[in-house]
């Protein structure tokens, strides 16, 4: 694969800032000759750590560094790659990078090293996406899931699934060639059962992946309730500082407030919503609409009630919301302000009776237990919306293939199964345009 006339690319691979070591990386046909020029060392052996002095174009020393040469195709990109491990900080790494550019390399685009690895067959697209997500991993569980995907777990699963589908297609196409004969009944039933199994498996993977998406991106927890139930007090207690305004005036929080906290090993974004009540103020009404949106976008919802007062119409609206979303969302019901009295019974909702201004440990413990239940690192997981969309499209075509199979319209059935195969295959090696790939790899950081 040619990349801009076999160009050699260069970038700083480590994060910008102060550190003990920085890594500058080059990849392409000129990598070795450029390394020889900067180090004034001709005998550079592959996969050997060479201690060298690097020089600028005026033969002035820049730094003493470790130079490692990875000869093609045994490198991350599949090309000749050289890494310079120099002293950390911004200045030295930038000086080395500038000399590499003077010597014939060009500055790499974001994600270009991974893009070259993809086009050279060193990684597939699911592995490339996992690399990008690993850099931004928010938890240990995320790192474990992504490490498996980088190792090829999803790729292997997809290949096995494609083989099953291709086998089904082969059975059908043999019968298409003999159009005068119907598909044998036992074979049709066998194919239907195989499709049922594949469909059920894919549906579980999509549902599980959506449910566990917070492991990768961080979980979102919405705090809802009518005004003055203690939502802002809870957020402040979780943060251990006063982020939200606490007031006895209803409607003080008129917009959603988001803050991130670690609960156990999980990164959690708490959303303190506007109180859900009959709104007479346009601004407050917008806040309430955003509260409902926050519920729909959240993984977990904490519903707050004032235990010191009987349920009123506004509380009942919250209970109606819980009933509406209980099959889609996880809820934790909190009866707050028990220090002022206990005048409502929420035992049907397994409520926590507490005063969030005094003690939130029971709530954080229940929340952590719930978050831990998401953390199944053993199951296959789709880690990007692109992967989920590909499987969803495949499921649509499996459904569309059923009637043609039952009606004996085998060519139409084969058309839909081909769509399924293409869609599933696109997870690892898409057939789309280079423009899409440019966009995807462009979201990587420099040096990857």
Curated annotation (Swiss-Prot):
Binding site residues for Mg(2+): 232, 253
Record bears the keyword Metal-binding: yes
Cofactor note: Binds 1 potassium ion per subunit.
Required cofactor names: K(+)
Amino-acid positions noted as binding (6S)-5-formyl-5,6,7,8-tetrahydrofolate in the UniProt annotation, renumbered to this chain: 25, 83, 122, 448
Enzyme class, spelled out: hydrolase
Keywords: Cytoplasm, GTP-binding, Hydrolase, Magnesium, Metal-binding, Nucleotide-binding, Potassium, tRNA processing
GO cellular component: cytosol
Residues bound to K(+): 228, 247, 249, 252
UniProt: GTP binding residues: 228-233, 247-253, 272-275
Enzyme Commission number(s): 3.6.-.-
Record-level Gene Ontology MF annotations: GTP binding; GTPase activity; metal ion binding
TrmE-type G domain sequence ranges: 218-372
Family to which this protein belongs: Belongs to the TRAFAC class TrmE-Era-EngA-EngB-Septin-like GTPase superfamily. TrmE GTPase family.
SUBUNIT field: Homodimer. Heterotetramer of two MnmE and two MnmG subunits.
Cited function: Exhibits a very high intrinsic GTPase hydrolysis rate. Involved in the addition of a carboxymethylaminomethyl (cmnm) group at the wobble position (U34) of certain tRNAs, forming tRNA-cmnm(5)s(2)U34.
Annotated protein name in UniProt: tRNA modification GTPase MnmE
Biological source species: Nitratiruptor sp. (strain SB155-2)
């Amino acid at each position: 694969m040619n990349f801009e006339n076999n160009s050699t690319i260069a970038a700083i691979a480590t994060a910008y800032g102060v550190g003990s070591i920085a890594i500058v990386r080059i990849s392409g046909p000129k990598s070795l000759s450029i390394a020889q020029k900067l180090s004034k060392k001709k005998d550079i052996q592959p996969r050997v750590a060479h201690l060298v002095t690097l020089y600028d174009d005026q033969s002035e020393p820049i730094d003493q560094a470790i130079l490692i040469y990875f000869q093609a195709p045994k490198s991350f990109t599949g090309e000749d790659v050289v890494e310079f491990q120099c002293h950390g900080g911004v200045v030295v790494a930038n000086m080395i990078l500038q000399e590499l550019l003077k010597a014939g390399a060009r500055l790499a685009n974001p994600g270009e090293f991974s893009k070259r690895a993809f086009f050279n067959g060193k990684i597939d697209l699911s592995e490339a996406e996992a690399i990008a997500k690993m850099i931004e991993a928010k938890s240990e569980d995320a790192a474990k899931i992504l490490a498996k995907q980088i190792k090829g777990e999803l790729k292997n699963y997809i290949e096995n699934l494609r083989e099953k589908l291709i086998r089904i297609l082969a059975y059908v196409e043999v019968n298409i060639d003999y159009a005068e004969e119907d598909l044998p009944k036992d074979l049709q039933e066998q194919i239907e059962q195989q499709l049922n199994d594949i469909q059920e498996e894919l549906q579980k993977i999509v549902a599980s992946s959506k449910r566990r998406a917070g492991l990768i991106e961080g979980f979102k927890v919405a705090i809802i309730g009518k005004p003055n139930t203690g939502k802002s007090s809870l957020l402040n207690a979780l943060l251990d500082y006063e982020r939200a305004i606490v007031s006895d005036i209803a409607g003080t929080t008129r917009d959603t407030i988001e803050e991130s906290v670690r609960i156990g090993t999980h990164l959690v974004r708490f959303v303190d919503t506007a109180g859900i009540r009959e709104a007479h103020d346009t601004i407050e009404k917008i806040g309430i609409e955003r509260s409902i949106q926050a519920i729909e976008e959240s993984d977990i919802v904490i519903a707050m009630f004032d235990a010191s007062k009987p349920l009123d119409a506004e509380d009942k609206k919250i209970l109606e919301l819980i009933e509406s979303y209980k099959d889609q969302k996880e809820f934790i019901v909190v009866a707050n302000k028990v220090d002022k009295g206990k005048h409502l019974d929420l035992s049907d909702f397994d409520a926590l009776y507490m005063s969030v201004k005094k003690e939130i440990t029971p709530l954080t413990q229940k929340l952590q237990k719930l978050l831990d239940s998401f953390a199944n690192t053993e199951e296959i997981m789709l880690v990007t919306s692109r992967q989920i969309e590909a499987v969803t499209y495949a499921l649509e075509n499996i459904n569309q293939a059923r009637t043609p199979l039952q009606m004996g319209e085998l060519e139409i059935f084969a058309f839909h199964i081909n769509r399924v195969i293409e869609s599933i295959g696109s997870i690892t090696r898409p057939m789309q345009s280079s423009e899409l790939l440019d966009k995807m790899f462009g979201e990587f950081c420099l040096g990857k």
